[in-house]
Design a protein with these regions (language model features):
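Glycine-rich phosphate-binding active-site loops on the catalytic face of alpha/beta enzymes
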Residues: 41-45, 145-168
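C-terminal helical cap(s) of enzyme catalytic domains, especially alpha/beta-barrels
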Residues: 158-191
């Protein structure tokens, strides 16, 4: 039902749909509805899922596991590519550290390493790294200044009503303000914000 709802939103608003594939047995259904397949951080090492993503014919967002090294992320991306899909987008969404006031630590040093050593698009997910709405704009601005290729930002018309990850959701006004603040940063480094 969720996939059909996403497909309706794509038709109504002309959006591309990215959704997470949690199990290889769901591959046919996800590929039928999604424009972009996402492999979540917890599933980064699931070879069956990576194989299904590699055979999907769709762009794949591969999220880095919170305990995974950069090389392990690259190796998993290479595995997807070995299955016939070179449309792999790497996603940094935070790693586990000794800090416990944020959900994860967004590894900006790792992003710089990936930019230097990998020829793949790199996006960041500050929503999951921070875990709270109040820091997402700052992280998004830092990521944009690094020249990354995209951001995953969680929004909800009523964040406190969200059924999952409510504390990290931006309301539409917060998202609009953040988006506006990213434009001059993107322009300053020769990027276009869409």
């Amino acid at each position: 039902d969720g996939l059909k709802l996403l497909a309706e939103m794509r038709e109504k608003y002309g959006l591309l749909i990215a959704t997470e594939m949690r199990d290889a047995t769901h591959a046919d259904k996800v590929v039928k509805y999604a424009d972009i397949v996402q492999v979540g951080a917890k599933a980064m090492y699931d070879h069956g899922l990576l194989t299904a993503a590699g055979q999907s014919g769709k762009p794949v967002i591969l999220k880095r596991g919170f305990g995974s090294t950069l090389q392990e992320l690259v190796n998993c991306a290479d595995f997807i590519m070995s299955c016939g899909n070179d449309q792999v987008i790497l996603c940094e969404r935070g790693i586990r550290s000794f800090e416990n006031n944020t959900r994860f630590t967004l590894d900006l040093c790792g992003v710089a390493w990936l930019k230097q050593h990998c020829n793949r698009p790199i996006i960041l997910d500050p929503s999951h790294a921070m875990g709270y709405a109040y820091g997402i704009g700052d992280l998004a601005r830092a990521c944009t200044a690094m020249g990354i290729d995209g951001l995953l930002i969680e929004t909800h018309p009523c964040p406190q009503c969200a059924q999952s990850d409510a504390p990290q959701q931006l309301n539409h006004q917060q998202f609009g303000e953040m988006y506006t603040s990213l434009k001059p940063i993107a322009q300053a480094i020769g990027k276009t914000l869409i």
